[in-house]
């Protein structure tokens, strides 16, 4: 008989509770990502000086590039390659969720996906017989946060926390952004990609995802980044790039 042990059914918190919205925001129904990220997108459009129509073309072309990556990713949730026109055109199967985002510009969290990472010392990896050419080393890490209340942020068209964290993680690794071969930006909505690219100094027309992103690759809630890391680790192992 297995020696089953009874564990406490109450989860142990690993961080403090975070209040995400002010009463004034809630009163205006600004509480969920589908209401918040469209505000960021509108700010980015205004700063760029684009018309609504031109900006829809711009962000749909961005997401078409993500869809093209997903079409070649064997682990992607949606392998159909969408055109920019299909992504921006509102239809019965691509309804408007929160202007300016139709469904195909929103994170797809209705998925059944999982990913895992194994972290260990080099000594342990050697003892387990993992070939040396399969080892992937994390070089550095950093953590920063924008203000939880969006009404307290100075602007909606930039993300100082990402800029600071990105600069610091590169400093710790002794690299520049141009030294990074493989990039996967968080992509719950097009504005997240634009903000991340701008803050990190990345070309918006470059390949900014290795999975296809949260809409096409799949957006399993707060576990997406693990999928991105696992995908990049696999590509590093296969020699697609040296850094990611």
What are these regions (language model features)?
Residues 224:
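Short glycine/threonine-rich catalytic loop with a Thr-x-Gly-x-Asp
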Residues 242-244:
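Short, intrinsically disordered, charge-balanced linker/junction segments flanking boundaries
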């Amino acid at each position: 008989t297995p020696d089953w042990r009874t564990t406490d059914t109450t989860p142990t918190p690993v961080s403090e509770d975070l209040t995400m919205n002010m009463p004034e925001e809630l009163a205006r129904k600004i509480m969920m990502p589908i209401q918040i990220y469209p505000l960021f997108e509108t700010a980015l459009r205004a700063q760029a000086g684009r018309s609504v129509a031109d900006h829809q073309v711009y962000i749909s072309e961005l997401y078409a590039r993500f869809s093209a990556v997903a079409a070649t990713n064997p682990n992607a949730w949606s392998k159909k390659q969408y055109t920019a026109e299909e992504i921006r055109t509102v239809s019965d199967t691509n309804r408007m969720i929160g202007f300016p985002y139709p469904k195909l510009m929103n994170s797809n969290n209705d998925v059944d996906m999982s990913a895992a990472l194994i972290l260990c010392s080099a000594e342990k990896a050697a003892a387990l017989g993992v070939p040396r050419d399969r080892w992937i080393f994390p070089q550095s890490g950093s953590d920063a946060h924008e203000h939880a209340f969006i009404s307290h942020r100075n602007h909606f068209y930039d993300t100082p926390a990402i800029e600071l964290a990105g600069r610091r993680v590169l400093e710790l690794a002794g690299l520049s952004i141009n030294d990074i071969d493989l990039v996967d930006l968080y992509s719950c909505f097009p504005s997240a990609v634009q903000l991340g690219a701008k803050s990190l100094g990345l070309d918006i027309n470059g390949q900014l995802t290795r999975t296809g992103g949260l809409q096409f690759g799949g957006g399993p809630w707060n576990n997406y980044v693990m999928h991105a890391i696992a995908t990049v680790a696999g590509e590093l192992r296969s020699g697609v790039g040296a850094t990611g």
